[in-house]
């Protein structure tokens, strides 16, 4: 009986060691894959941000060149005056549209 108990003890211990190693390998592999995925996503995000910034810089350059060639440089006061005129036109058009809808209804 002593031999069977001792054999069961060593069998249980070996089972626990192998199971522990397998779990450790599984967790290590999972964390490794997670690290790879994280690195890939960070790189994709970095490339996306770089592309967005590049396009925005190109648009600013193109729009700036178009504005400068058509009208020349615009001061802040001129820009504000233009915005005020556009807002006034929009308000006037909204009022006319409202009157038109009221008369049609």
Swiss-Prot record:
> Sorted alphabetically, which keywords does the UniProt record give?
Coiled coil, Thylakoid
Q: Does the keyword rRNA processing apply?
A: no
Q: Which cysteines are joined by disulfide bonds?
A: none
Pfam families reported for this sequence: DUF6825
Q: Which GO terms describe its cellular component?
A: plasma membrane-derived thylakoid lumen
Q: Which residues form a coiled coil?
A: 76-105
Subcellular localization(s) per the UniProt record: Cellular thylakoid lumen
Primary residence? other
* UniProt keyword annotation of Ribosomal protein present: no
Q: Which domain of life is it from?
A: Bacteria
GO-annotated biological processes: thylakoid membrane organization
- What PANTHER family does the annotation carry? BNACNNG14650D PROTEIN, OS04G0513000 PROTEIN
- Name the chain's protein: Thylakoid protein sll1769
Q: Which organism is it from?
A: Synechocystis sp. (strain ATCC 27184 / PCC 6803 / Kazusa)
């Amino acid at each position: 009986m002593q031999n069977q108990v001792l054999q069961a003890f060593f069998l249980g211990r070996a089972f626990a060691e192998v199971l522990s190693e397998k779990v450790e390998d599984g967790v290590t592999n999972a964390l490794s894959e997670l690290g790879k995925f994280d690195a890939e996503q960070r790189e994709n995000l970095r490339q996306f941000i770089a592309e967005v910034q590049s396009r925005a810089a190109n648009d600013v350059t193109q729009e700036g060149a178009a504005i400068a060639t058509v009208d020349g440089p615009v001061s802040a006061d001129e820009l504000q005056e233009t915005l005020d005129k556009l807002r006034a036109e929009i308000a006037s058009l909204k009022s006319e549209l409202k009157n038109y809808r009221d008369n049609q209804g």
